């Protein structure tokens, strides 16, 4: 029989599990299994699973919480997440999160939406460093912003600087204009493009 453990989970978390200082942590799901054997601490949440770690909210079909101080979170199946303070949304097949380093790794069909900067990016792998506000995208990278469309196999997005570095057959489309090179740097404030190596382009006047 499955039971909603929301209240029970809160009791377990706040009464018996050590925390990272200054980090609020809670979780809920339809069912739970777990153990606290030394060196093998693991809690498995299934069915409408949800974890909140400070400003980060994660939801998935299954979530595994492991390690001392619940350091590692592994979300599997229809994963959705939101960094509430920065207004960043995630969607992916699988997400692994390190609460100490504040690094999220998204695997499979993955989307990152930065609502503040009005950017949507998709790829097969995303690594987001929340402390540095840097995202790395790999494999079938697509980034959309207003009339700007960027494609490549590898990209680095620096959120604070609002810059995008593209490599691996990069292409940038600005309305009807097209730019290709070995490496392309995009200023997302102005949509200006800087290119290096085998530069090609077409501009519609």
Language-model segments: which ranges?
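Mature-chain termini and adjacent capping regions
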Residues: 1-205
């Amino acid at each position: 029989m499955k039971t909603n453990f929301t209240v029970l989970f809160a009791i377990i978390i706040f009464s018996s599990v050590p925390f990272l200082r200054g980090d609020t942590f809670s979780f809920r799901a339809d069912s739970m299994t777990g153990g606290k054997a030394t060196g093998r601490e693991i809690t498995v949440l299934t069915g409408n699973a949800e974890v909140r770690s400070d400003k980060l909210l994660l939801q998935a079909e299954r979530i595994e919480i492991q390690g001392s101080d619940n350091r590692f979170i592994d979300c599997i199946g229809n994963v959705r997440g939101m960094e509430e303070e920065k207004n960043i949304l995630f969607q992916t097949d699988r997400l692994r999160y390190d609460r100490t380093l504040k690094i999220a790794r998204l695997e499979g069909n993955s989307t990152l939406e930065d609502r503040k900067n009005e950017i949507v990016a998709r790829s097969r792998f995303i690594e987001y460093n929340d402390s540095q506000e840097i995202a790395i995208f790999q494999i079938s990278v697509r980034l959309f912003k207003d009339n700007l469309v960027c494609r490549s196999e590898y990209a680095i997005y620096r959120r604070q600087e609002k810059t995008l570095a593209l490599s691996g057959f990069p292409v940038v489309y600005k309305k009807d204009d097209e730019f290709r090179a070995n490496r392309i740097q995009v200023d997302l404030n102005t949509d200006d493009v800087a290119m290096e190596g085998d530069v090609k382009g077409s501009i519609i006047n």
